[in-house]
Structure formats: C-alpha cells, structure tokens
Amino acid sequence: EGVGISEGNSISSIEFEFNGWGNNYELNNQTIKLSHVSESSIPDNSYPDYRDLTLSNTLTVISDFDLRISSSRNWVQITFDTPFVWNGSDNILISWENRDGTWASNYGYVEGSSSFSNRSARPVSGGSQTPDP
C-alpha cells in the first residue's frame, strides 16, 4: 500500500518544494504526466531514458499550465485537471515537461531526497526533443 493511498484511489494533486528561485519566477506552458511503472528504480543515466522501463496507463494529469514561484523557498501544490488512479502495486513515474521554449536567470531547483538515488533530469529544448514517457 502506498503512503496514505490505497489501490483504486485517485491522486488529484502533488506538491513540490522549490528552492533558490527568484521571487515571482514564472514557469509557462508546463505539463505533468504520471505513469505506472513496474521497475523499482530508474536506470542511472544523466537524462531520462524511459525506453527500458515498463510503463502503463500514462496520463497527462495537467497540461499547458503556468506557475509563479512566489518566494525563493516555497512549497507549491499543483492540482491536476485529470486525477490519476493508482493500481495499488506499481511505482509511479512523474514526468514534468517544460514546453515554454525560453528561460530566464534566477531559476532554482526542486528539493529531493538523497534516498532516491535513481532519479534523473535533463534540460530539453525544442518540441521535437521532449522525452515522451
């Protein structure tokens, strides 16, 4: 059983802790997708490579949204347009796609935990290079 969620229950939002961002930094045209994944870890690559993962039920839970980071360290809750139903057994892969195409200085990072040694990220530019889980 997942932390606070049982099989068949819906996930309708997610929270991230943003750190080091300039006040009122804007993230435009963002998309978040969730997938069931049977593997217990992500390959140790310098960028997301989902080709060797067994993904199912990939769902765009929110797309084309804008986000403003109000302070340099802040928890932000993102409510999904479409809830994701967890199957009760698989892990969940969260894919965040920045489809804005531009960037500005004063961007920061999203806090993580050192217990997640198999996480990865890759900056991508241009719509044709966006990883597709």
PLM ranges: what are they?
Residues 1-21:
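A short beta-strand-loop element at or near the start of a globular domain
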Residues 19-22, 108-109, 128:
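Intrinsically disordered, low-complexity boundary segments flanking structured domains
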Residues 117-133:
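PGST-rich, cysteine-poor low-complexity/disordered linker and tail segments that act as flexible spacers
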